[in-house]
């Protein structure tokens, strides 16, 4: 089940969960990285991004784990670590703001290790049955 308006991929016990897969830092990168994750502060419409959605949890994928973070904890991480400075390149976006030219979205790059520090729980993929 996916609800694009409320920004969640599935629900468990009435709490929305948004799952974020591995992503590249730059489009030119050969492969996605598990060491960093993009966090959407504002979406392409200029409204609150998925980090500020009504979801209860965001699940971040790594090669071997699912890192489950409460949305409010993620918001605190953004508030406490992100510098309100815009950068022009994705390679400079670690804890800074990046906005594509002509778009209203605002994203920042965070370290996966910092997500693990605030995680509600971390699940080993080998322990999770598909």
Regions found by a protein language model. Give the residues of each.
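Nucleic-acid endonuclease domains
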Residues: 1-130
